[in-house]
Structures are given as C-alpha cells and as structure tokens.
C-alpha cells in the first residue's frame, strides 16, 4: 500500500509542478530585460546634444551594441534550455520542437538587433558629418527608425512569449491529463488497499481482545490460587497459635492452683481473726 501511495502522490505532484512552470505573474525573463536595454540605448542616440554626439565614437557604439546583442542571445539560449529541461519529463517531443522554434525566433530577433546596430552606427556617422540644418533631418530619421525598431522588437519578443505560452499550455494540459489518468487507474487499487488495511486492523483488534481475555482469565486463576494459599497460611497460623495457647495454659496451671490455695489460706486467716474480736455490749 505504501508504494501505491507514493506513486499516486508523485503523479499528483507532477501535475502541480507542470502548472507552476507557467504562471501569469511570473517575473520578466532576463532576455526581455536585455532587449529593453538595447532599444533604450538606441533610442537615446536621438536625444543626445550635438556636443555629446561628437564625443561618441562609432566603434565604441558598435562594441556596446554588440555586447548587448551577445548578452541577449546568451540569456535567451539559457532561457530556452531551462524550459526544455523542465518540459522534457512531461512532453519530450514538445520540448524538442519548442527548442527548434525558439532558435528560429531568436535568429530573427538577432537579425533585427544587428540591423539596428548598423543603422545606429550609420546615423551616428551622419550626425557627425552633416551640417546643423541637415542634422535635424538625420535626427528625424533616427526618431522614425527607433519607433519602427521598437515595434519590431516588441513583435519579436511577443512572438517568443506567445510561442512559449502555447507550449507551456500544451504541457500543462498533458500533465493534468496524465495525473487524472494515473488517479483513475490507481484509485481501485487504493480503495482495495484501504479495505485490506481496514480488515487487517479489525483482525488485529480481535486478536488483542482475545489476548486481553486470556490474560484476564490467567490473572483470575492466579488470584484464586493466591487466595487459597493465603487462607491456608492463615489456618496454619491459627492452629499453631491455638496449640501454643493450650501449651501455655498447661504450663501455667500448677501456678494457678498454688495461687488459689494461698488465697484461700489468707481468707481463712481473715475469718479467724474476725471471729476472735470481742463482741461489743
């Protein structure tokens, strides 16, 4: 019965763990934070003053954006591997397909971010070389592009998020179905085991009652034997004492007779003395 309980508990726990993998209030994944940082970095290029723009090096901008792209892809890869690891026990086929889909979407996101890096480097160079009147035109184009970039990055992020949600929902459904199937399959065995345990407890209870009755009877027999032994001991003691009293009486009898004789002599002497007294006239 213990093994059935453990197996059934594991099945229920599996369903609970699967549901916990997809929660609406889950914190934002690290890779999404990196995408937001990338876009903010690009959009801030259009807000820099002319003097600050002149101090920014194109190579420096390219390296920093490359770093953000690399970090984003690394976080997204780690996120994908973590999801695949968690999904494999419940749906290995879906986990493998999710990994492939995320690779395609990650490639699309990387392409858009790389394009944004190249465009930003190009715009920076134009801002440095254009005259003041043309600089405004470049800034307008930068502003337009950053708005479009925001939409593209949001779309890429949303596609990844929706893809993950779809697979998580499927996995949750499978896990729930498996848990219900296991429950239905093992419920008769659980009931049978429970009935067996109840019968065993009943048998044990009857055995304990029988043993208790046997012990009670043994105690009654022992108590009766002890009573008889005590009565026998008391009778022996009484007989012994009676014998001692008779013996003591026999020993004291001569002395009693002698005392009576002496008392009688004393009484006779008193009578004689009384008779000898003169009679008053």
From Swiss-Prot:
> For the region 3 X approximate tandem repeats, what residue ranges are annotated?
34-66
Task: List, in alphabetical order, the GO biological process terms annotated in this UniProt record.
Answer: acylglycerol homeostasis; cholesterol efflux; cholesterol metabolic process; chylomicron remnant clearance; high-density lipoprotein particle assembly; intermediate-density lipoprotein particle clearance; lipoprotein biosynthetic process; phospholipid efflux
Ordered alphabetically, the record's keywords are: Extracellular matrix, Lipid transport, Lipid-binding, Repeat, Secreted, Signal, Transport
Compartment(s) where it occurs, according to its Swiss-Prot or TrEMBL record: Secreted; Secreted, Extracellular space; Secreted, Extracellular space, Extracellular matrix
* Propeptide segment residues: 19-24
Q: Which domain of life is it from?
A: Eukaryota
As given in the record, the signal peptide range reads: 1-18
What's a Gene Ontology MF term here? heparin binding
Residues covered by region (9 X 22 AA approximate tandem repeats):
67-281
Q: Could you tell me which residues the sequence repeats occupy?
A: 67-88, 89-110, 111-132, 133-154, 155-176, 177-199, 200-227, 228-249, 254-281
* InterPro entries recorded: ApoA_E, Apolipoprotein_A1/A4/E
> Which residues are listed as membrane-spanning?
none
- Its GO CC terms? chylomicron; extracellular matrix; extracellular space; extracellular vesicle; high-density lipoprotein particle; intermediate-density lipoprotein particle; low-density lipoprotein particle; very-low-density lipoprotein particle
Family, similarity comment: Belongs to the apolipoprotein A1/A4/E family.
Subunit structure, briefly? Homotetramer.
General function of this protein: APOE is an apolipoprotein, a protein associating with lipid particles, that mainly functions in lipoprotein-mediated lipid transport between organs via the plasma and interstitial fluids. APOE is a core component of plasma lipoproteins and is involved in their production, conversion and clearance. Apolipoproteins are amphipathic molecules that interact both with lipids of the lipoprotein particle core and the aqueous environment of the plasma.
Can you say what this protein is called? Apolipoprotein Eb
| Naturally occurring in which organism (per UniProt) | Danio rerio
């Amino acid at each position: 019965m213990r093994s059935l309980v453990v197996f059934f508990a594991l099945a229920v726990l599996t369903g609970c763990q699967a549901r916990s993998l997809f929660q609406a209030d889950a914190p934002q994944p690290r890779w999404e934070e990196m995408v937001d940082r990338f876009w903010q970095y690009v959009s801030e290029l259009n807000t820099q003053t002319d003097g600050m723009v002149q101090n920014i090096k194109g190579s420096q901008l390219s390296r920093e954006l490359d770093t953000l792209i690399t970090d984003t892809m690394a976080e997204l890869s780690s996120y994908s591997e973590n999801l695949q690891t968690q999904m494999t026990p419940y749906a290995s086929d879906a986990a493998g397909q999710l990994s492939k889909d995320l690779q395609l979407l990650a490639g699309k996101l990387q392409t858009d971010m790389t394009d944004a890096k190249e465009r930003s480097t190009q715009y920076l160079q134009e801002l440095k070389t254009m005259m003041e009147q043309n600089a405004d035109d470049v800034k307008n184009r930068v502003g337009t592009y950053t708005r479009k970039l925001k939409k593209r990055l949001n779309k890429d992020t949303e596609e990844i998020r929706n893809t993950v949600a779809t697979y998580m929902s499927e996995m949750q459904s499978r896990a729930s179905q498996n848990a219900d199937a296991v429950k239905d399959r093992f419920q008769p065995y659980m009931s049978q085991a429970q009935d067996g345990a109840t019968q065993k407890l009943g048998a044990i209870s009857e055995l304990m009652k029988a043993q208790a009755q046997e012990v009670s009877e043994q105690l009654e027999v022992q108590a009766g034997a002890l009573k008889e032994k005590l009565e026998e001991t008391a009778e022996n003691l009484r007989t012994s004492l009676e014998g001692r009293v008779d013996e003591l009486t026999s020993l004291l009898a001569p002395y009693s007779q002698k005392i009576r004789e002496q008392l009688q002599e004393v009484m006779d002497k008193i009578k004689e003395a009384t008779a000898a007294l003169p009679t008053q006239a």
